[in-house]
């Protein structure tokens, strides 16, 4: 990992050190013990939405892995190798403890997902569930994911929806009114009395689509998720209620494939057939 992290990464590392002590370390055993893959705060089953590629035999890098419970699920469902990358030592300590306890053979690397010290084209799939997809600059981490993927490899990530972000006030729970512009959003600096100051990144769908295309990705799938019928408010991440999430999508999943052609190169022209 480079000696100097961006200032927002330093703040986010401090926030996740506190969050690990307050919640994620205590919840890690239950998450790692789970066999079913579920998505986000509403635990939407992968068996219902079927957005992941076939995992059997894949080498996967999780960018912003936290305690790496999702990486554990990927390994249980057939991934040959899973490497988790994160900048927060406390989160990685918890992940290593869980890995030893459950014996799944995950690997871990302390590094910034915007600049991972690994060779080009090392993985078949890059993944992030509220990791790099939320806490890193998309203009940096998405091209980095592309660099790490082999041609034809896939990027799958979950983040907040446009609607959630424009309805989220600085200090209150989400509401039903637009409180901030989507245009020019990109970076949001938050202050929380419990965990401290943090920085998230969010760009609109059209901007994100262009970032993916510039990095050499073709978008394969896109899903917006609502709270499930039996969903309840999350015990720790309480800024979005189940009631709100049952009416409007609060989470979204993107799946993209690294093109086998050079980023920015035009597709081969086809000769017109004579009639």
Regions from the language model: what does each represent?
Residues 114-125:
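A short acidic, Gly/Pro-enriched loop at the edge of an enzyme's catalytic core
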Residues 1-31:
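N-terminal, positively charged/glycine-rich alpha-helical extensions of SAM-dependent methyltransferases
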Residues 139-154:
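A short glycine-rich, Lys/Arg-flanked "PGG" loop and its adjoining helix->strand segment in the class I
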Residues 31-58:
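Conserved alpha-helix/loop element of class I SAM-dependent methyltransferases that forms part
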Residues 199-222:
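Short alpha-helix
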Residues 154-188:
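Conserved class I S-adenosyl-L-methionine
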Residues 125-139:
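A short SAM/SAH-binding and catalytic strip from SAM-dependent methyltransferases
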Residues 61-115:
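Class I SAM-dependent methyltransferase SAM/SAH-binding core
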